[in-house]
Amino acid sequence: MVNMKASMFLTFAGLVLLFVVCYASESEEKEFPREMLSSIFAVDNDFKQEERDCAGYMRECKEKLCCSGYVCSSRWKWRVLPAPWRR
């Protein structure tokens, strides 16, 4: 069982190494490691959290308005989901 796990790990590591070597041979730039790391860890603007004018779930009830679907709890003083007993 252990030999099978080790051989699978080595096979996977070999495939990853083969991919990196093939990609490096096709790359014409000298700064391959930096380019590879920057492409792996690049952050797209679509994934960044955007600022909103309303406050969401479990946020403190102060000057910001509640987002649609939330109400300000009079007991706990934060935003919660509306329920029949909270209306």
UniProtKB/Swiss-Prot annotation:
The keyword Transferase does not apply. It is found in: Secreted. Disulfide bonds join C54-C67, C61-C72. Expressed by the venom gland. Residues 25-52 form a propeptide. The keyword Signal applies. InterPro entries: Huwentoxin-1. SUPFAM superfamilies: omega toxin-like. Belongs to the neurotoxin 10 (Hwtx-1) family. 51 (Hntx-8) subfamily. Hntx-8 sub-subfamily. This is U3-theraphotoxin-Hhn1b. It comes from Cyriopagopus hainanus (Chinese bird spider).
